[in-house]
């Protein structure tokens, strides 16, 4: 990390292979100041340093946190982040966008899958465990027989579990199961000495029923019409590289086609649980999302610090198009036995289409003032144009342009230590609000919201101490948010849980500041320790329409997040690992003041290796801690429908066995 001039956490292959549950949602606990919002089966949205979307209901699909897999943008679709056969995961904290085509206000999550190799190799893995867990994965690749210049890697994976919940009404334990498949083919072709091509074809299929929420907050659901949280994404990507005398030309092209179903039993119950009242509501959204991305980069050769070459640079242009269609079907019935005119029935169907074109120009230059001091300058200009229309007659076509950039100074103190300082300006595009009954040319300030801008200041230190027995990385940051985008929701009809209205506004400003500390320590030849700590303080300021939130912390921004762990090599074949991860309390929303409770989860793993085989016995949340990852505040109980806090709880104790074969 000695050349980095920003806060970045890298999770390597060794760590990712050792994790029994192959999904980024589970691994995210290891990254300080990274949180997620799990409203449905899988977490789709992440927050870095307290900034990021928490849901995708009736909102322009903009993402403050970028999410890339193999340079392909899946922002706002984090549920597809399966992590089998992964080379590394990078979490970049703070504004990004001057080195790559994708833009990110709060930070960027980048997943790099395994590349084809010159020699044949592979991995096979089987996992079985409690709650119906059965996972199987196989990945292999190498050179194609007829050509050494053509290599491939094929990855196949399926993950199954019953979802940790039981539906007491139906007597089933699979109404929130997970059935997730990953298929990926990568082909590398060295066409000429200086020209190469990379091809990617993948499909990620999440066939996950969604029966999550309960009236009493338990893991026992009562729904008579469980919903779905399914997603199937087909991806096609092509990268072309050509080396010139002093720089490399890169072309990155991709297409994604995603089908999503988000449906749920909105009353969370059944005729028996609501008796004597009739209270039965269901909502279904069918979404089709297509993206097209084309990016060109020119990347200089690495500077060699001779008098004629003290710089390295990248410049690029990126085009990103997204088209999204939604069909929403809601139905329901409400009846009070004391009302002679009831029950009352409702049914609605609507459709909408959204498209957006984003064109950006970006660049970064590193200038080496001397062998130990590097100055970096980066800039990004982006223009977006979007169109929206729905069956209610609402239509919008907002557009805007935004400018961001970064300046940093990196000083190498010794062969094993460096310090850096950076100032970066990032942005997130604006949008519009629906169902306000306003014309597109209305001057009402609630109709549109503006882009948000964030200026981030960081100072950091990376160092290796005690003959490299200890690695430490520390970052102090301060972020100033201008025109902060804040989402609030209200329920129009208290007897109909399908009548929520969502409103995004620009608060005048907000601040996010804190500390991130990573320590790796080799205590003895057989004992390793790691500690990762995130401290965060956030505020909402000068929001004229919500003066009651003045100075309050932002939603999903815990003050403390941490991961502590120790690994003991008992023998050359056996090892034992124990880690503790946790978060302090945080506000669930900007619409109300309810908070989660702080929690800590302990995980244990025993590993034994024989030749190319590795066997693991593992347990997650070994003390069966009851903790919450999402909360809603509204009324969902007839007949009074009093507002109360409903919480979605995380996974209970989970035990299993994994066998892995490396070949």
Residue ranges and their predicted role:
Residues 45-47, 91, 103-126, 134, ...:
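N-terminal periplasmic accessory domains that precede
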Residues 56-57, 64-95:
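Short acidic/polar hinge/loop motifs at secondary-structure boundaries
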Residues 121-123, 128-161, 165-208, 232-234, ...:
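Transmembrane beta-barrel wall of Gram-negative outer-membrane proteins
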Residues 188-193, 202, 298, 310-312, ...:
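Structural signature of Gram-negative outer-membrane beta-barrels, strongest in the C-terminal barrel
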Residues 205-218, 321-325, 385-387, 410-458, ...:
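Surface-exposed extracellular loop regions of Gram-negative outer-membrane beta-barrel proteins
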Residues 239-266, 412, 418-424, 450-513, ...:
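Membrane-embedded beta-barrel scaffold of Gram-negative outer-membrane proteins
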Residues 299-300, 313-316, 368, 372-375, ...:
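Gram-negative outer-membrane beta-barrel transporters
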Residues 482, 529, 582-587, 608-663:
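C-terminal beta-signal and adjacent terminal beta-strands/loops
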């Amino acid at each position: 990390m000695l050349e980095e001039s920003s806060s970045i956490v890298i999770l390597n292959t060794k760590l990712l292979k050792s994790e029994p549950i192959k999904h980024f949602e589970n691994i995210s606990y290891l990254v300080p100041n990274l949180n997620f919002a799990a409203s449905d089966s899988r977490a789709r949205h992440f927050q870095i340093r307290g900034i990021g979307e928490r849901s995708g209901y009736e909102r322009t699909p903009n993402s403050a946190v970028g999410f890339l897999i193999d340079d392909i943008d899946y922002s706002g679709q984090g549920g597809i982040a399966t992590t089998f056969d992964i080379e590394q995961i990078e979490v970049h904290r703070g504004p990004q966008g001057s080195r790559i085509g994708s833009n990110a206000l709060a930070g960027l999550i980048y997943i790099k899958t395994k590349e084809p190799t010159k020699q044949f190799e592979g991995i096979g893995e089987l996992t079985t465990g409690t709650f119906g867990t059965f996972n199987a994965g196989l990945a292999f690749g190498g050179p194609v027989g007829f050509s050494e210049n053509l290599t491939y890697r094929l990855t196949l994976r399926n993950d199954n579990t019953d979802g940790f919940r039981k539906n007491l009404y139906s007597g089933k334990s699979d109404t929130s199961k997970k059935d997730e498949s990953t298929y990926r083919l990568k082909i590398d072709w060295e066409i000429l000495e200086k020209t190469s091509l990379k091809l990617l074809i993948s499909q990620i299929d999440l066939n996950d029923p969604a029966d999550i929420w309960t009236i009493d907050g338990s893991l026992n659901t009562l729904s008579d019409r469980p919903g779905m949280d399914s997603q199937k994404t087909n991806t096609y990507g092509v990268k072309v590289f050509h080396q010139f005398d002093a720089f490399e030309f890169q072309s990155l092209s991709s297409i994604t086609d995603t089908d999503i179903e988000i449906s749920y039993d909105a009353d969370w119950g059944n005729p028996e649980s609501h008796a004597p009242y009739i209270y039965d509501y269901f909502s279904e959204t069918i979404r089709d999302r297509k993206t097209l991305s084309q990016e060109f980069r020119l990347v200089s050769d690495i500077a060699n610090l001779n008098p004629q070459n003290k710089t390295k640079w990248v410049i690029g242009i990126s085009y990103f198009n997204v088209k999204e269609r939604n069909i929403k079907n809601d139905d329901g019935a409400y009846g009070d036995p004391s009302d002679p005119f009831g029950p009352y029935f409702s049914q609605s169907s609507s459709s909408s289409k959204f498209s957006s074109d984003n064109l950006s120009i970006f660049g970064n230059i590193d200038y080496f003032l001397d062998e130990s001091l590097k100055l970096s300058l980066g800039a990004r200009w982006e223009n977006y144009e979007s169109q929206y229309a729905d069956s209610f007659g609402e239509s919008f076509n907002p557009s805007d342009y935004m400018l961001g950039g970064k300046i940093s100074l990196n000083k190498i103190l010794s062969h094993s230590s460096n310090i850096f300082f950076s100032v970066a300006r990032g942005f997130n595009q604006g949008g519009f609000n629906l169902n306000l009954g306003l014309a597109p040319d209305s001057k009402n300030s609630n109709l549109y919201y503006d882009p948000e801008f964030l200026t981030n200041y960081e100072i950091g230190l990376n160092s290796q101490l005690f003959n490299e027995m200890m690695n430490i990385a520390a970052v102090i940051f301060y972020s100033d948010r201008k025109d902060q985008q804040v989402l609030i929701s209200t329920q129009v009809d208290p007897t109909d849980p399908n009548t929520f209205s969502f409103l995004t506004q620009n608060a005048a400003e907000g601040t996010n500041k804190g500390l991130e500390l990573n320590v790796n320590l080799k205590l003895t030849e057989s004992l390793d320790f790691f500690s990762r700590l995130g401290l965060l303080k956030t505020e909402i300021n000068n929001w004229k329409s919500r003066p009651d939130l003045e100075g309050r912390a932002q939603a999903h921004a815990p003050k403390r997040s941490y991961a502590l762990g120790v690994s003991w090599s008992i023998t050359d074949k056996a090892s034992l690992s124990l880690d503790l991860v946790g978060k302090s309390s945080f506000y669930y929303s900007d619409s109300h003041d309810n908070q989660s409770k702080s929690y800590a989860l302990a995980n244990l793993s025993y590993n034994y290796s024989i030749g190319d085989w590795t066997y693991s016995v593992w347990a997650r949340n070994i003390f069966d801690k009851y903790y919450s990852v999402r909360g809603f505040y509204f009324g969902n109980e007839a007949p009074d429908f009093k507002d109360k806090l409903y919480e979605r709880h995380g996974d209970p104790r989970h035990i299993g066995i994994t066998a892995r074969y490396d070949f």
